[in-house]
Amino acid sequence: MKPSIYSLTRQEMIEWAEAQGEKKFRAAQIWEWLYRKRVQSFEEMTNLSKDLIAKLNDQFVVNPLKQRIVQESADGTVKYLFELPDGMLIETVLMRQHYGLSVCVTTQVGCNIGCTFCASGLIKKQRDLNNGEIVSQIMLVQKYFDERGQDERVSHIVVMGIGEPFDNYDNVLKFVRTVNDDKGLAIGARHITVSTSGLAHKIRDFANEGVQVNLAVSLHAPNNDLRTSIMRINRSFPIEKLFAAIEYYIETTNRRVTFEYIMLNEVNDGVEQAKELAELLKNIRKLSYVNLIPYNPVSEHDQYSRSPKERVMAFYDTLKKNGVNCVVRQEHGTDIDAACGQLRSNTMKRDREKALVENVQP
């Protein structure tokens, strides 16, 4: 199976071209065709020799993903189901924000973190995505607009889709550097957010990388007992270890950390828990931000329900009174398979049911 050309960084592209006996500027031409002109085949690279195009075709594909399903919401949110070369499925989501077009990318097929409220974890991790497969998600979303003649550009990226980004650390870091490259998509570092469920050692590594992207941490509870019951990962990285890493990150980068907090009715959304969260954040209050997330119900996790608006606002008001910067996240795509992993999970379920019907037919 040939790799995607998107899997190469610009420096790797230069090294590849030189290994083929080509001049360095040929790599710059290929890079421009891919990321500025956004062609979908090597044959469209009209200033390259036939010999070089043949080498590219022999060694790479452009985009390895196949579009299976597109769902468009009334609010402009677009959810994509892509098929990988090995037949596995991933999701990507485009969200229209007041500040631009934001794309949420997937980094793994399935997830091993085991959050008890999440559709992504219903299917265990099967493999990591490589850099090319992650970049391809952005390029296909951009193609969606290019083909419609819409003069719109992906401006923001959130690495919050299926999987734990820091469990696929090297490929995610390579992806960030690829899309941030000023000769390519040139998406600003401060327009890129990487999320983690709390791999403390990787947060420390990330602090030392020198990338100026945003960090978000899925917290979802203010104490160990509750967090462990919601997120299995807390057994390995309890709050004390997690916050030591977060404080190291803030001291090293002087960058703000966003805390994601999903609102589960009568589970983690009480006023006392809001006070506990404010106390937890008191030492990093100036460089922290809490994102309160309305819960999208998942049928397989029917022990949870969405917090009523009055409980959400009481939680929000308590944080505010205690000096915590916070916001209630705007919802997107509520009329489609909105929860992370839901479209993929539902599609796989339908595919299995279809296969069973076909197998029993005479």
UniProtKB/Swiss-Prot annotation:
It comes from the Bacteria. InterPro entries: Aldolase_TIM, Methyltransferase_A, RlmN_N, RNA_MTrfase_RlmN, rRNA_lsu_MTrfase_RlmN/Cfr, rSAM. One of its GO terms (molecular function) is 4 iron, 4 sulfur cluster binding. The keyword rRNA processing applies. It catalyses: adenosine(2503) in 23S rRNA + 2 reduced [2Fe-2S]-[ferredoxin] + 2 S-adenosyl-L-methionine = 2-methyladenosine(2503) in 23S rRNA + 5'-deoxyadenosine + L-methionine + 2 oxidized [2Fe-2S]-[ferredoxin] + S-adenosyl-L-homocysteine; adenosine(37) in tRNA + 2 reduced [2Fe-2S]-[ferredoxin] + 2 S-adenosyl-L-methionine = 2-methyladenosine(37) in tRNA + 5'-deoxyadenosine + L-methionine + 2 oxidized [2Fe-2S]-[ferredoxin] + S-adenosyl-L-homocysteine. Binds 1 [4Fe-4S] cluster. The cluster is coordinated with 3 cysteines and an exchangeable S-adenosyl-L-methionine. [4Fe-4S] cluster binds at C111, C115, C118. Its EC number is 2.1.1.192. Its cofactor is [4Fe-4S] cluster. It is an enzyme of class 2 (transferase). Reaction proceeds by a ping-pong mechanism involving intermediate methylation of a conserved cysteine residue. Specifically methylates position 2 of adenine 2503 in 23S rRNA and position 2 of adenine 37 in tRNAs. Belongs to the radical SAM superfamily. RlmN family. This is Probable dual-specificity RNA methyltransferase RlmN.
